[in-house]
Design a protein with these regions (language model features):
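N-terminal, polar/charged subdomain of small-to-medium soluble alpha/beta proteins
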Residues: 1-88, 92, 104-154
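Short, conserved glycine- and acidic-residue-centered signature motifs
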Residues: 98, 102
Length: 154
């Protein structure tokens, strides 16, 4: 499971011209779900997003986390994050989870985030979304929690 996190002073996601979610200072996280991802990957990714130290302390060093700052978290599903771009001129999406399990895992991640932190907002899985954001820094990181090594046995 992948999160591309960006430190922002504000971020908003709109669907069909209507604001779906909005935060002030905090993290915008674009989320990609891979085929073998499950609840363990979602939970670990959430912990990393909440505890990753990307906010400045009093000395200006990145020593504070989202939990420390009580900043907002905007989760936006984005399946192209798991694209294979190693060759050719067109991305391949064979690593991406199918829509139904990806949606379920994104919703699980969102629910866990809302239970663990506030404020949390989100985009809509499968919708065409428009994002407005102001990067702070800019500070952008790629967080990845590898999928399970093998598919669960039947």
């Amino acid at each position: 499971m992948i999160a591309l996190i960006q430190r922002v002073t504000m971020a908003r996601v709109q669907v069909a011209g209507r604001t779906q979610g909005e935060i002030g200072a905090g993290l915008l996280a674009l989320i990609g779900v891979e085929q073998l991802d499950g609840p363990a990957q979602a939970q670990r990714l959430l912990e990393r997003m909440l505890d990753y130290r990307v906010f400045p302390d009093d000395a200006g060093r990145m020593n504070r986390s989202l939990r420390d700052t009580a900043g907002g978290l905007l989760l936006v599903p984005q399946f192209p994050l798991v694209a294979d771009t190693a060759s050719g001129n067109r991305p391949g999406f064979s690593r991406a989870a199918a829509p139904a399990p990806a949606r379920a895992l994104f919703e699980q991640l969102l629910g866990a985030a809302q239970a663990a932190h506030a404020p949390v907002a989100a985009g809509i899985f499968g919708a065409h979304m428009e994002l407005t954001l102001t990067n702070d820094g800019p500070v952008t990181f790629w967080l990845a929690v590898p999928p399970a090594a093998t598919a669960p046995e039947a």
